[in-house]
Amino acid sequence: MYKKAQNPVVVTIVMIVLAVALIGGFFLARHIGEKNRETRKSKTEVEKLMELDLDENYPGTAREVLKINNRLMKCYYNEELTDEQIKALAMQNQKLFDEELLKRNPYDVYVGRLKKEIESYKKSKVTIINIGLQELADAETEEKGGYKFCNLLVSYFLKEGNGHKKTNHKYYLREDENGKWKILFWEVTTKTF
């Protein structure tokens, strides 16, 4: 059989084309991977809170419950939210509420009040610039009527127009039958921690 000799120029060109394609493919795959990582990292706080699975990953302590509640507060009053985002965040917020608080604040009523409060904050140009949360070791705790209670202080540092002010709230939480701490109610207080 007769075998035709390979042209060295053609072989060299084919090898160069394959090398360029291989190197180009590597860099393209790397670039796409970096873009995907950036997309995952660049979620807003609103998106992160909306995606929280509180049914499966409920916070383990009363303080952790209030940390999530405070993150929600900052979003309500500091971010420009759509109606859908407000509703989704309110639904997440209500997962932190005790049954008694839910009875007094059905979802639709809660969302309506929340929208009015957000609008009031926006008109007054009030934003939350920082939040202080009492340490769990310093919290008031008690057992009463077969329930465990935990009271924690939260300080909200607000920017109002050109000035600043601080408001303190006392949150009352109760542990439910599943061992989950839920917000029973809160009130404005002069106490600080």
Residue spans for each PLM region:
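Short beta-strand edge/turn micro-motifs at domain boundaries
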Residues: 2, 34-44, 164-193
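Core segments of small alpha/beta cavity-forming domains
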Residues: 45-123
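Glycine-centered tight beta-turn/hairpin loop motif at sheet-sheet or coil-to-beta transitions
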Residues: 98, 161-164
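Juxtamembrane and targeting peptides
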Residues: 2-81
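Hydrophobic core residues within well-ordered beta-strands of beta-rich domains
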Residues: 65, 150, 167-169
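A mature extracytoplasmic/lumenal domain signature
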Residues: 108, 135-137, 154-158, 171, ...
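Surface-exposed, charged secondary-structure patches
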Residues: 113-161
